[in-house]
């Protein structure tokens, strides 16, 4: 992690570390880095969004950069608008699935991919130097407002085709996805039942679309006898899915299903995922001609590998999917349309999910101050190799150790002051045993850091 940017841009509590002053610096630094041109900016529904967005815009304009403000806009719409308007970069004001007191700044390249860590380090260097470009009064950037949502929907309709109509329960989580996702589903010919569709920074449910937060969605699917339930986080870069029986579909299972559908749709090829993805993905995709490539956690790492290898699909076991034939921006809205196309072609998700191997996956979050993370990881890496009998080791992001029918990943969060443990085993008893050892190891390492 850098001084300001983590694994998913800047993401901090508003008016603590993320202040209008810092946002102004980001705008000035980005404008200086670009040296001119045009930038698209949008925000999610957080109460601090206008404050941060206005500061970033001011910084950009002061360097002579033209700004297109698309207002309340999910991250996928910002990524689409960058290409639509021929912009040199994009900015999303969002903290994605974090609690409402957080906000963030994420910067996107002209191709829709997030800024790499190297590019973010350059922005940080400019921010700290204070050596910003200063446009004279007659060369200040121009500001205009636009709404690319209709163009987004029309473009998506050319890509996704349904032969039948379905009942879809859609939970936007009071986030920015509410201004696009329900409308796309209706244009596809589906009957849409909306939950939490009013844009608000006072979120009704936890934003991360998981089994716990989507209990109301699951119940509604059952009561309404819907074909599927779809949910988004605050900026709709993620998707959560509830099947036709009203059961939340685990991230790993859904990732396997949609990756398999993409292989059927576009032919065999490379599927990019992250080090926290389990064995099921490999086992399910191998017969379909899929070669799984693992990389660091974060959509920018997935997008980068997709671009390098010409991959068919990329995704994380967190509901973050990238469809390279569409864009290199993670897109939960377009993903929702693809889920309906998969159902239309292959059948109900409850039946499809039976084909995906099921292993026991456990996750834990251990509080860890950001300043202790580096030292704690040194201790964890050293002690883990002594504690566990392992056959394989992956250290591209944290440390992942493997031994036949199990694996454990230790990694510091890039967006929160926590240490993450993710593990998978074929047997539940073994998984619990491993997690017990792993949690004790991490807590001890943090106390010694």
UniProtKB/Swiss-Prot annotation:
Its cofactor is Mg(2+). SUPFAM superfamilies: Phosphoglucomutase, C-terminal domain (SSF55957), Phosphoglucomutase, first 3 domains (SSF53738). It comes from the Archaea. CDD domains: PGM_like1 (cd03087). One of its GO terms (biological process) is carbohydrate metabolic process. Catalyzes the conversion of glucosamine-6-phosphate to glucosamine-1-phosphate. Does not display phosphoglucomutase (PGM) or phosphomannomutase (PMM) activities. Belongs to the phosphohexose mutase family. This is Probable phosphoglucosamine mutase. It comes from Thermococcus kodakarensis (strain ATCC BAA-918 / JCM 12380 / KOD1). The lineage of its organism: Archaea, Methanobacteriati, Methanobacteriota, Thermococci, Thermococcales.
């Amino acid at each position: 992690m850098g001084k300001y940017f983590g694994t998913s841009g800047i993401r901090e509590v508003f008016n603590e570390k993320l202040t209008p002053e810092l946002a102004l610096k980001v705008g000035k630094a980005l404008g200086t880095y670009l040296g001119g041109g045009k930038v698209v900016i949008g925000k999610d529904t957080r109460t601090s969004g206008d404050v941060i967005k206005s500061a970033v815009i001011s910084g950009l304009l002061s360097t002579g950069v033209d700004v297109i403000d698309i207002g309340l806009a999910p991250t996928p719409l910002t990524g689409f608008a960058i290409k639509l308007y021929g912009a040199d970069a994009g900015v999303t004001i969002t903290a994605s699935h974090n609690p409402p007191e957080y906000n963030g700044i994420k910067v996107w390249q002209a191709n829709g991919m997030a800024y790499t860590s190297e590019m973010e380090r350059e922005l940080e260097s400019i921010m700290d130097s204070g050596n910003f470009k200063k446009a004279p009064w007659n060369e200040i950037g121009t500001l205009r407002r636009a709404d690319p949502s209709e163009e987004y929907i029309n473009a998506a309709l050319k890509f996704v085709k349904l032969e039948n109509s379905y009942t879809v329960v859609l939970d936007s989580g009071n986030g920015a996805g509410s201004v696009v996702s329900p409308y796309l589903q209706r244009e596809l010919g589906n009957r849409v039942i909306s939950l939490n569709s009013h844009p608000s920074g006072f979120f009704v449910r936890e934003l991360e679309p998981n089994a716990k937060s989507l209990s109301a969605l699951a119940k509604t699917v059952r009561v309404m006898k819907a074909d599927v339930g779809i949910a988004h986080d605050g900026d709709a870069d993620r998707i959560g899915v509830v099947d036709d029986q009203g059961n939340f579909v685990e991230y790993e299972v859904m990732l396997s299903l949609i990756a398999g559908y993409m292989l059927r749709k576009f032919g065999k090829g490379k599927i990019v995922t992250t080090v926290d993805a389990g064995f099921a993905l490999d086992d399910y995709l191998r017969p379909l001609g899929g070669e799984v490539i693992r990389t660091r956690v974060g959509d920018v790492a997935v997008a980068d590998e997709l671009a390098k290898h010409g991959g068919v699909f990329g995704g994380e076991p967190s509901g973050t999917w990238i469809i390279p034939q569409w864009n290199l921006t993670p897109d939960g809205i377009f993903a929702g349309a693809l889920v309906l196309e998969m159902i239309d072609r292959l059948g109900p998700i409850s039946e499809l999910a039976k084909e995906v191997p099921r292993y026991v996956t456990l996750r834990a979050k251990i509080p860890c101050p950001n300043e202790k993370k580096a030292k704690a990881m040194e201790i964890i890496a050293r002690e883990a190799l002594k504690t566990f009998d392992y056959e394989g080791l992956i250290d591209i992001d944290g440390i992942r150790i493997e031994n036949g029918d199990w694996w454990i990943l230790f990694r510091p969060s890039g967006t929160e002051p926590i240490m993450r443990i993710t593990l998978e085993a074929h047997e539940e008893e073994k998984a619990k045993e491993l997690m017990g050892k792993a949690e004790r190891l991490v807590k001890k390492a943090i106390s010694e850091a």
